[in-house]
Amino acid sequence: MASTDSKQLYLFKKMLKELKSKKGKGTELISLYIPAGRRISDVAQHLREEMSQASNIKSKSTRKNVQSAIEAILQRLKLLKEPLEKGVVIFAGMVPRSGPGTEKMETYVIEPPEPIKTYIYRCDSEFYLEPLEEFLEDKDAYGVILVDRNEATIALVKGRNINILKKLTSGVPGKFKAGGQSARRLERLIDLAAHEFLQRVGQKANEQFLPLLQEKKLRGILVGGPGHTKNEFVEGDYLHHELKKIVLDTFDLCYTEEFGIRELLEKAAPLLKDVELMKEREAVQRFLKELIKEDGGLACYGEKEVLEALMMGAVDTLIVSEELEKYKVKIACNNCDYLEEKTVNKLELIKLEEELKNAQCPKCGGALSIVEEKDYIEYLSELCEQSGAKLVTVSSETEEGAMILNAFKGIAAILRYKIHQ
C-alpha cells in the first residue's frame, strides 16, 4: 500500500468521523453535494433562492443560523475553480462547542475520492454523510465456500471484513465397513444424502453470490475443505455455471468454520494480495516474524524507538493503528522565538488549551499559544514520505490490528537495517 494512499484514506475516514460527531441546534446544518460538471453559478443561484426561503423560518435564531451557513457556503463557492473534475462537497453550520451560546460557524470543503453524481442540498440537525460513506465501502469481494460431508460455511471477504453468510450441516452418517446387500443399499442412501447436501450448499451459495456477480461486486470464489468433497462440489453441477467461471482455486484445509476461513486466507494470500485485510495481515506477520528472531530481527515498536528509526531513514514499513488518536502540537511564544513541540492525546489537548490561557513563556514571560495542531498519523505519514517508507494503517476490528493496538501501543515498524547492535 502506498503511503500517500493510506494517508489519504485515513484522513478521509477521520474527517467523516469528525463530521458525524457534529450536531446542530435544530435543522441548521447544511450539506451540499455538487456533482462534476455542475456550473458554480447555477449552484450559487440555487443557494440565493434558499436564502430567500429561509427568511420564512419562524425561529429567529434558526433563521439567522441557516442564512449564515448559506452565506458561508456562497463565500467558499467563490474560491472554487471550474471545471470540478470530481465535484465537491461543502458542509456548513453553527455547531455548539459545549452548552447553549457556544455555537460557532464551521465550514468544511471536501474533494471526494470519486465523482459526485447527484446534486444534493440538505438542511438538518446533522450533516448528511451517506454518499461519502459509500465511497469507503469496498467494491470488490471474494466468496468463500468451505465444505466437507458433514458441514459447510459460506462467507464473504470484503476489505477488512469476513462476513459469515450461511452455516449448513448435512446429517450424513459416516461410511459403513460391513458388507452385504443392506450395507450397499445404506451406502447408496448415504451417497444420495451427501449429493443432496451439496445441492443445498450450491443453492445457498447461488442465492448469496449471484446478485453480487450481477452487480459486478464479486471478483472470485475460493473453495476449500478437508478431503475430496470440495472437488466433488466444484466439478459437479452444484454451483451456478456463471459462478463456476470465477472459482479461483480449491484448497486443502483442516477446518470448515471460522478457523478454516483464516487457514484458507493464508493459503490464498497470493490471490488476495489486493484485499485490505491481506495487506494488514501480511505487514503484521512480517513484523512478528522479525520480532521473534533471536537477535530481535528487523522489528521495532514503541513511539520513541519508531520515531528514532524514522528520523534515521531506517524504516521500511510503518504499521500504525487507526485508533492512535494523538496530535503533534507546536507551542510558540507571541513575543520571542521560543518554540516547543508536544505529542498529546485528545483529552490532553483540551487540557493543554486551557493551561496555555494562563501560561507564560519560560524564556521571556510572554503569552503562549498553539500555532500548529496536526493529527499524529498524518505527521508520521509525512516522515514516511520523506524517507520513502511504506505506511500501513490497521483497524482494531481485525485480529492483527487489535494486536498492534493492545500489545505494541498502536505503533510498530519493520526496519531496513538494524539501528542498535
Curated annotation (Swiss-Prot):
<dbReference type="GO" id="GO:0018444">
    <property type="term" value="C:translation release factor complex"/>
</dbReference>
<dbReference type="InterPro" id="IPR029064">
    <property type="entry name" value="Ribosomal_eL30-like_sf"/>
</dbReference>
<dbReference type="GO" id="GO:0005829">
    <property type="term" value="C:cytosol"/>
</dbReference>
<dbReference type="GO" id="GO:0016149">
    <property type="term" value="F:translation release factor activity, codon specific"/>
</dbReference>
<dbReference type="InterPro" id="IPR005140">
    <property type="entry name" value="eRF1_1_Pelota"/>
</dbReference>
<dbReference type="InterPro" id="IPR024049">
    <property type="entry name" value="eRF1_1_sf"/>
</dbReference>
<dbReference type="InterPro" id="IPR005141">
    <property type="entry name" value="eRF1_2"/>
</dbReference>
<dbReference type="GO" id="GO:1990825">
    <property type="term" value="F:sequence-specific mRNA binding"/>
</dbReference>
<comment type="subunit">
    <text>Heterodimer of two subunits, one of which binds GTP.</text>
</comment>
<dbReference type="Pfam" id="PF03463">
    <property type="entry name" value="eRF1_1"/>
</dbReference>
<dbReference type="InterPro" id="IPR005142">
    <property type="entry name" value="eRF1_3"/>
</dbReference>
<keyword id="KW-0963">Cytoplasm</keyword>
<dbReference type="Pfam" id="PF03464">
    <property type="entry name" value="eRF1_2"/>
</dbReference>
<dbReference type="InterPro" id="IPR042226">
    <property type="entry name" value="eFR1_2_sf"/>
</dbReference>
<dbReference type="InterPro" id="IPR020918">
    <property type="entry name" value="Peptide_chain-rel_aRF1"/>
</dbReference>
<comment type="similarity">
    <text>Belongs to the eukaryotic release factor 1 family.</text>
</comment>
<protein>
    <recommendedName>
        <fullName>Peptide chain release factor subunit 1</fullName>
    </recommendedName>
</protein>
<comment type="function">
    <text>Directs the termination of nascent peptide synthesis (translation) in response to the termination codons UAA, UAG and UGA.</text>
</comment>
<dbReference type="Pfam" id="PF03465">
    <property type="entry name" value="eRF1_3"/>
</dbReference>
<keyword id="KW-0648">Protein biosynthesis</keyword>
<dbReference type="InterPro" id="IPR004403">
    <property type="entry name" value="Peptide_chain-rel_eRF1/aRF1"/>
</dbReference>
